[in-house]
Amino acid sequence: MEQKRAHGVTPGLNKDYTRRKAEHQAAFVLPYLKPGMNLLDVGCGPGTITLGLADRVKPGPVTGIDHDKINIESAEKIAVKKNITNVSFRMADAFTLPFKENSFDAVFENNLFVHLSDRAIDSAREIFRVLKNGGFFAARDADADSVVWGNQNETLKEFDKIFYLWQQSRGSEITIGKKLPVILREAGFINTIKTVSADTKGDPESVKSHAGIIISLLEGPLKKFIVDNNLGDSFFLGYLKENFISWGEHPDSFFANVHVEVIGWKQT
């Protein structure tokens, strides 16, 4: 089964994915990692977080899986460039993991479940299956109900509503973060620990880059959704883009995407 991304695939968004690092997106799980662990990263994307995890558990093996061939190829190239040898990448489906039961000491996912929506529980159960007894699963997903826009205006609020409808139409659930404790518990995990962090665009360069990502969506897949669903015309689209250009250049602008983080254990 092909798993859709929570956003349209644009060059700007792909570049943004490569900026993600274990030191931030996986900070909540780093204290639990030990050298020699066998770790799986489900929905690894371009692998930049995976490589950071591999550094923490070396010489233990780390496997990154993703349904996107381009992501896997990108991850492999970065691993070679950084000379990280205890990591491997492969294409795989999050619902039918190609591993035996009790294979891994730890499993990690960052913003995978937003893509899977109500099937996230199926993936969580597969993750439970491949974990060793006593192993843990660390899940981190966004919750768009808690998005913070610095220098927000009414147009940005309107964009948020449209963006939510678009994701919903694609089968994505961008408010799934708050449901992670329930998902992990129903999949069989115990003793869950919950924390919250945010992916923030706060410096002028990252703010302008984030505005550019949104503009590229408005010129691509989101444009079609708006027009097809009579949510706006070409004038409205132009107005949105002009607002994001101005927002991206304003000194008070920032963006924070709040994420819920949950670690759960498989009983020994």
Language model features with spans:
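Conserved catalytic/acceptor-binding region of the Class I
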Residues: 138-207
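A short acidic, Gly/Pro-enriched loop at the edge of an enzyme's catalytic core
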Residues: 95-107
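C-terminal helical/coil "lid" or tail adjacent to the Rossmann-like core of SAM-dependent
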Residues: 3, 11, 193-254
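A short glycine-rich, Lys/Arg-flanked "PGG" loop and its adjoining helix->strand segment in the class I
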Residues: 121-136
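Class I SAM-dependent methyltransferase SAM/SAH-binding core
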Residues: 40, 46-96, 121-122
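A short SAM/SAH-binding and catalytic strip from SAM-dependent methyltransferases
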Residues: 105-120
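Conserved alpha-helix/loop element of class I SAM-dependent methyltransferases that forms part
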Residues: 19-37, 52, 56
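Class I SAM-dependent methyltransferase Rossmann-like catalytic core
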Residues: 1-22
